[in-house]
Structures are given as C-alpha cells and as structure tokens.
Amino acid sequence: MLTRKQIELLEFIHKRLQRDGVPPSFDEMKDALDLRSKSGIHRLITALEERGFIRRLAHKARAIEIVKLPEALMGSMQGGFAPQVIDGDRLDPPVGAMPVSGIHAVELPVMGKIAAGTPIEAISEVSHTVAVPGQMMRQDAEHYALEVKGDSMINAGINNGDIVVIRETSVAESGDIVVALVDGHEATLKTLRKRGNAIALEAANPAYETRVYPAEMVRVQGKLVGLIRSY
C-alpha cells in the first residue's frame, strides 16, 4: 500500500507527462508536495521504484518510466493508461546555450560530504543532485556523488569542495582512490594500499599521515571515477 505522499508524487509525475511530455524537475516535485528538501523526493521515488510503480532508466537525465498506477488513481484518469518513457534530454536548453555533440548529462544524487582528511561520520542522506557527463560512468554499475571536505588529497588533484563521482563496488586494487568505511561508521576518501592482512589509507598530502587498519575494519564503498569542480 502506498502512502499519501507517494500517491501524490505519482499522480503529479503522471499528469506532467500527459500534459508536457517531459518530467517535472526535483525542485518542482518538492514544491508540488510542499517538502522542505529534495532528499524527501529521492526517498519517495526510491519507494515507488521498489514497489514497481516507476522505473528509472540508467544514464539518462531525469528519465522515468511509469510502469503502473494504483487503483486509487486509475479511476480518476481518463483515456486509460499506457507506460511511457520521459527523457529529460528533450527539455529546451537555456537561452544562449551552445550544443555539445555527443555529451549527455546524468543527474546523480550527492550523498553528503566525504572527508579528504580525518575520517568523518558516514553520511548517506541525499543533499542535492548534480549533472554528470554520462561518459564518466559504466552502464553495468551504480554511481553516486559526494562533496569533498578537506585537503588531504590535493596532490591527487582533489580539492576541498570538489564533487567526486563514485562507482559502487566493494572491490579495489592497491593504488585505487576509494571511499572507505572504517570500523562501520567513519567514511573517508583515500588511496587504498594492501599490506598483507592490513589496509593502508594513504593521503595525497604530506601534512596527513597514512593510517593502517586491520583488513576487517575497512570496507570499500566505491571507487573514484570522476571529478566535478566549480569555479
């Protein structure tokens, strides 16, 4: 059974598809449901997807397929229902925008901040979304983004405030820059080095020491595949 907010969001998306042929933005969804942050929209969309009402298409910006509607909505919809895919790439570009051939953007959730310094408490709450070139990502994997906090990776070209694009994986090789979860609750962005039965998390700044942990204390959460910087 869907919650009232889930039904409201599904109805809003469906009506926008029928009217405009393009999906509402996350900001529009947030305003329509009178929510204070877009993280609430992400949770609702995830719940609808898990229950089989919508499907998000990988590597297409804001592409949503409505699979079915609940009975509570079917009676109020005229003309029947047919699943359809709404491709966010069809939105009109801003005035003055220049077309870039062969590039399309994927909207990724920014799952909070990651420490490039001393490990901080792991954050898994969506703070906002960011448009990422689809070429950064593999089609057979999930991805997310994090905002960098700290300067321990500056010699690897990663600065405080950068957005890093992470491919979800639990496997990494020595020398990979990874998101590592230490002791189950502290997350950090570091270069991973395997040392026998231990794992070293190495900074790219001489001001920070390399930290070494028993292998069972470190869990790889993902591997760095790209970086976005605002000037």
UniProtKB/Swiss-Prot annotation:
One of its GO terms (molecular function) is serine-type endopeptidase activity. Residues 26-46 bind DNA. It comes from the Bacteria. The active site is at S152, K190. Keywords: Autocatalytic cleavage, DNA damage, DNA repair, DNA replication, DNA-binding, Hydrolase, Repressor, SOS response, Transcription, Transcription regulation. It catalyses: Hydrolysis of Ala-|-Gly bond in repressor LexA. InterPro entries: LexA, LexA-like, LexA/Signal_pep-like_sf, LexA_DNA-bd_dom, LexA_repressor, Peptidase_S24_LexA, Peptidase_S24_S26A/B/C, WH-like_DNA-bd_sf. GO terms for biological process: DNA repair; DNA replication; negative regulation of DNA-templated transcription; proteolysis; SOS response. Belongs to the peptidase S24 family. Homodimer. PANTHER family: LEXA REPRESSOR, LEXA REPRESSOR-RELATED. NCBIfam families: lexA (TIGR00498). This is LexA repressor.
